[in-house]
């Protein structure tokens, strides 16, 4: 996940950085630092952010080389 994907997904969900941090179980400065490009996250924190976002039906999109290319909305798990 890139900082741009994180910001876009959070915006689509209408979440503040504080809300994403709460849902992911990470510190607010972790989200802020990552989204601003000033902080490289450890894999566990990226995974936590990604789980929180994907649980709400956002898919992170990558090309065949693994490069981030965007996000897409899908129904949350159990949704219609």
Describe every region a protein language model picked out.
Residues 9, 23, 34:
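Residues in the recognition helix of alpha-helical DNA-binding motifs
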Residues 26-41:
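Recognition helix of helix-turn-helix/homeodomain-like DNA-binding domains
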Residues 40-43, 65:
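Non-catalytic, surface-exposed connector residues within folded enzymatic/regulatory domains
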